[in-house]
């Protein structure tokens, strides 16, 4: 009885009672978990207990599982370690509970699933699935029994690795289809079954491969889309959306007779959830068909037929889809919150996908709607017309769109002053897309001046409009810079089409970053990002404005650092950190543009601010990363002159290298070590012992994220290049580390791991290259220090030979391997020739490199081949 009373107190309005109850339960779980679980499951199984006690007991049992995969695995092990008798008792009680609960959702179904996900993978509880199937198919089962059992099946399918259920798919499907049939009187049962089907689709491939079973499943799902209960209808449509993605190749039989009509009807529904699924179906069709188009072009390049082919459903349905989608665009809500997903937003996304998928074919279907409504007195229609226009800018041939966009420019400029904020917002977004996708239409002589005028005014508009205007400026600056004329002997243009307005734009953006409503719609960060793009893409005659901007950013950074002591709340701290990060990133961008002599004048102040930031932000990884990146830029701009800051900066570099818990910070610190080596050359030597020790510790530490390790290996090469023969004292341990790293193996079916392996190999090759070049020296005569690597040359060439035989190698790996072969030839001469001759795959790798489309691989492979030929001629 005591347990029931305590469980009932877990919902007590009295805080003290509530805390006491929670403490009691936590203590009971620690003191004797098996007994505690048996007692809880007994409370859950007894229909005589209060609903509150039963729900609370179910919740306590469910706390045995977790959404976090690592914690979940620990909990599952903990459950399996409990005595088999206690486990059996708990399982019997939770199974008995199914069908006895009068409340929804069922607690027991979640408990059954939690236990099943721990036991089925280790071949325990074999009687569970047959028992669940019997609960559903037994004609005497109650509605509650069928519903809660189907819920349990759905949860198991959702949470377990699909491979674990492959051999049970027939039984599970039998139960699910039984619950979905149109003869089933209860909509609650139908809903539970339809949701369970949605979760089971991944592992029922064998059933979809068989025509008769597929027909039956499709028939039941299509019938469920006509159910009068909205919940069932939505769940059935969700199934169709997912089936389309998983089993596209089988859908031809059903598209004409059923799917087309069902989904078109759903799109027209006044019920948002139904309309959303109808639109989502066609968005998925586009996604699939775009993937198939890529597959087809890759197959054509390789001269083979594609494995799967597109049926071009999207293209065929355009004339029916576009009118519904454009009509749906007119249903927007004036006070719409950005986070609410609704049919109007989904229609915009679907139009964009159709545009990318069907290319030129979409234009004639959308154009009449745009022309008819872009000046409609009703703001909803004006907005829909602009939205439709913005949505079709990517996909069709730019030359087909350009005349239309140029023709629309005056109207769009006018709509930037529309009385409706929604229309202004959409127009600003559309102008941004034009600047990004068809910039020639924006930077033409006729419209550039009025466009700039309306964009500058737009920065003072509501945050949602101004935020889109910032993005338009970013794209415009990039396009203007690309289009500018650059003299042959110069790296950047002397002037460009934004020069005359440059100072005003920068001034307005700086004002925008300071707006009191800057936290709305991401406006502040959009304005800073836009400022960075504009400065990055500025011509030479804008330099005075860049100088001014640099001073403003430095001043702001100092002001922000002085605010630190006044921060009270967590939300203030978050805003403060965000602002520091934005200022750091902006500083980085302006420093890139600052001339060397100017950089020398401001570097003391910049470095003092950054050092202060490191002192104050030890707790914030994001800011540390941005500050390290800013130091990186300063190092590149100052070169050897950075040496004077090293003593003061060294401790913070160390903190960054040790901060492996936040791998982005650690990565930035490792990257910075490489920059320092390139800038300071041999002057980095006094700092190397400490840096090398930290780098080697990180390599040996299992808690360091794997992405950091390749970067560390390649930085060993940078260090050798900087300090030459002084690297000898680290050589043995580094060569052993490289030998170990170059023998790494990964699971080839995991594409992420294949990418990682290539990255790791590329880094090993870069490190070997740096070591050979650094020890060899850059004089005509090879320095004898390089002979310390001689005993490893055969291993290095075997490593390259192994890479050559691995068909997953990338162009980057080929380039690095070729470069290293060339360096080995110049360092060790004819010994290398013999070792290469014995490995014919290396020649194939060099041939592949010479034929590569990437410049680096081509150049290095050609050079390495020449070096080998030289040695052959000498021999």
UniProtKB/Swiss-Prot annotation:
**HEAT repeat positions in this chain?**
2-31, 33-64, 84-122, 128-159, 169-201, 211-246, 252-301, 313-359, 363-393, 401-437, 448-484, 499-536, 543-591, 599-638, 643-680, 685-723, 731-775, 785-828, 830-872
Question: Which of the residues bear the PTM N-acetylmethionine?
Answer: 1
Q: Which InterPro entries match?
A: ARM-like, ARM-type_fold, Armadillo, HEAT_type_2, Importin-beta_N, Importin_beta
Which residues are annotated as modified residue Phosphoserine in the UniProt record? 12
In terms of superkingdom, the source organism counts as: Eukaryota
UniProt's post-translational modification comment states:
Mono-ADP-ribosylated by PARP16.
Localization: Cytoplasm; Nucleus envelope
Pfam families referenced in this protein's UniProt entry, alphabetically: HEAT_EZ, IBN_N
Under Gene3D superfamilies, the record lists: Leucine-rich Repeat Variant
| Region ranges (Ran-GTP binding) | 333-418
- Region Essential for high affinity interaction with RPL23A: list its residue ranges: 285-461
- What are the Importin N-terminal domain coordinates in residue numbering? 21-100
Q: What are the record's GO terms for cellular component? A: cytoplasm; cytoplasmic stress granule; endoplasmic reticulum tubular network; NLS-dependent protein nuclear import complex; nuclear envelope; nuclear pore; nucleoplasm; nucleus
- Identify residues that carry N6-acetyllysine: 210, 834, 866
Q: Which SUPFAM superfamilies match?
A: ARM repeat
Citing just one GO molecular function, the answer is: Hsp90 protein binding
Annotated region described as IAB-binding, given as residue ranges: 328-341
Q: To which protein family does this belong?
A: Belongs to the importin beta family. Importin beta-1 subfamily.
Subunit (UniProt)? Forms a complex with an importin alpha subunit. Interacts with XPO1. Forms a heterodimer with IPO7. The KPNB1/IPO7 heterodimer interacts with H1 histone. Interacts with SNUPN. Interacts with H2A, H2B, H3 and H4 histones. Component of an import snRNP complex composed of KPNB1, SNUPN, SMN1 and ZNF259. Component of a nuclear export receptor complex composed of KPNB1, Ran, SNUPN and XPO1. Interacts with SRY. Interacts with PRKCI/atypical protein kinase C iota. Interacts with KPNA2. Interacts with KPNA7. Interacts with SNAI1 (via zinc fingers) and SNAI2 (via zinc fingers).
Role summary: Functions in nuclear protein import, either in association with an adapter protein, like an importin-alpha subunit, which binds to nuclear localization signals (NLS) in cargo substrates, or by acting as autonomous nuclear transport receptor. Acting autonomously, serves itself as NLS receptor. Docking of the importin/substrate complex to the nuclear pore complex (NPC) is mediated by KPNB1 through binding to nucleoporin FxFG repeats and the complex is subsequently translocated through the pore by an energy requiring, Ran-dependent mechanism.
Could you identify this protein by its name? Importin subunit beta-1
């Amino acid at each position: 009885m005591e347990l029931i009373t305590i469980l009932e107190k877990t919902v007590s309005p009295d805080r003290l009672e509530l805390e006491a109850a929670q403490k009691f339960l936590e203590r009971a779980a620690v003191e004797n978990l098996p007994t505690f679980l048996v007692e809880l499951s007994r409370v859950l199984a007894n229909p005589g207990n209060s609903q509150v006690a039963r729900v609370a007991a179910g919740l306590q049992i469910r706390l045995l599982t977790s959404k976090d995969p690592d914690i979940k695995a620990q909990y599952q092990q903990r459950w399996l370690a409990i005595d088999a008798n206690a486990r059996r008792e708990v399982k019997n009680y939770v199974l008995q509970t199914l069908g006895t609960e009068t409340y929804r959702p069922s607690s027991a179904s979640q408990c059954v699933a939690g236990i099943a996900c721990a036991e089925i993978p280790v071949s325990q509880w074999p009687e569970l699935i047959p028992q669940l199937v019997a609960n559903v198919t037994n004609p005497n089962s109650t509605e509650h029994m069928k519903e809660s059992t189907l819920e349990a099946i759905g949860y198991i399918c959702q949470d377990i690795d699909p491979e674990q259920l492959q051999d049970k798919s027939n039984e599970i499907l039998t139960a699910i289809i039984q619950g979905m049939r149109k003869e089933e009187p209860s909509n609650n049962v139908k809903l539970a079954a339809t949701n369970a089907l949605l979760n089971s689709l991944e592992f029922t491939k064998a059933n979809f491969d068989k025509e008769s079973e597929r027909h039956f499943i499709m028939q039941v799902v299509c019938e469920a889309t006509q159910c009068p209960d909205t919940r069932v209808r939505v769940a059935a449509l969700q199934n169709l959306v997912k089936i389309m993605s998983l089993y596209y190749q089988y859908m031809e039989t059903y598209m004409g007779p059923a799917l087309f009509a069902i989904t078109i009807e759903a799109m027209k529904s006044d019920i948002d959830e139904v309309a959303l699924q109808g639109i989502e179906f066609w968005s998925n069709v586009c996604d699939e068909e775009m993937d198939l188009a890529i597959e087809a072009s890759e197959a054509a390049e390789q001269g083979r037929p594609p494995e799967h082919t597109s049926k071009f459903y999207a293209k065929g349905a355009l004339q029916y889809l576009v009118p519904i989608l454009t009509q749906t665009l007119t249903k927007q809500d004036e006070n719409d919150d950005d986070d609410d997903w609704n049919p109007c937003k989904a229609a915009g996304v679907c139009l964009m996908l159709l545009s990318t998928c069907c290319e030129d074919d979409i234009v004639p279907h959308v154009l009449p709607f745009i022309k008819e409504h872009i000046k409609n007195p009703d703001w909803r229609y004006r907005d829909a017309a602009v939205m439709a226009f913005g949505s079709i800018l990517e996909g069709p041939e730019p030359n087909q769109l350009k005349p239309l966009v140029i023709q629309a420019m005056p109207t769009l400029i006018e709509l930037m002053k529309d009385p409706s904020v929604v229309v202004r917002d959409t127009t600003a977004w559309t102008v941004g897309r034009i600047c990004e996708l068809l910039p020639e239409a924006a930077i033409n002589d006729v419209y550039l001046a009025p466009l700039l005028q309306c964009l500058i005014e737009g920065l003072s508009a509501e945050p949602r409009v101004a935020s889109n205007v910032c993005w338009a400026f970013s794209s415009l600056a990039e396009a203007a810079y690309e289009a500018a004329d650059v003299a042959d002997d110069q790296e950047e243009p002397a002037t460009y089409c934004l020069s005359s307005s440059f100072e005003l734009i920068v001034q307005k953006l700086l004002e925008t970053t300071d707006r009191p409503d800057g936290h709305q719609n991401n406006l502040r960060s959009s304005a800073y990002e836009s400022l960075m793009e504009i400065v990055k893409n500025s011509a030479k005659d804008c330099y005075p404005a860049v100088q001014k901007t640099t001073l403003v950013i430095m001043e702001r950074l100092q002001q922000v650092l002085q605010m630190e002591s006044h921060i009270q709340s967590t939300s203030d701290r978050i805003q403060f950190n965000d602002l520091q990060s934005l200022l750091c990133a902006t500083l980085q961008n302006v420093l890139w543009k600052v001339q060397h002599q100017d950089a020398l004048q401001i570097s003391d102040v910049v470095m003092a601010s950054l050092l202060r930031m490191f002192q104050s932000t030890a707790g914030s990884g994001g800011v540390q990363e941005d500050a390290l990146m800013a130091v990186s830029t300063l190092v590149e701009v100052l070169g050897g002159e950075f040496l004077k800051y090293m003593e003061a900066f060294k401790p913070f570099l160390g903190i960054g290298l040790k901060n492996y818990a936040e791998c982005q910070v650690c990565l930035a610190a490792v990257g910075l070590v490489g920059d320092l080596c390139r800038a300071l050359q041999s002057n980095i030597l006094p700092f190397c012992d400490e840096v090398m020790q930290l780098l080697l510790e990180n390599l040996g530490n299992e808690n360091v994220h794997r992405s950091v390790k390749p970067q560390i290996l390649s930085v060993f090469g940078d260090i050798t290049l900087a300090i030459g023969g002084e690297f000898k004292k680290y050589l043995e341990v580094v060569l052993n580390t490289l030998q170990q790293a170059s023998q790494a193996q990964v699971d080839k079916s995991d594409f992420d791991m294949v990418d990682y392996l290539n990255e790791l190999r590329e880094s090993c090759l870069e490190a070997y290259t740096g070591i050979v070049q650094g020890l060899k020296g850059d004089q005509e005569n090879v320095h004898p220090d390089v002979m310390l690597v001689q005993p490893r040359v055969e291993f290095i060439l075997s490593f390259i030979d192994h890479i050559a035989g691995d068909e997953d190698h990338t162009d980057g790996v080929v380039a690095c391997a070729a470069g290293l072969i060339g360096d080995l030839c110049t360092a060790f001469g004819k010994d290398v020739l013999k070792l290469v001759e014995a490995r014919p795959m290396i020649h194939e790798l060099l041939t592949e490199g010479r034929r590569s489309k990437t410049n680096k691989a081509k150049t290095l492979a050609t050079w390495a081949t020449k070096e080998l030929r030289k040695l052959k001629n000498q021999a």
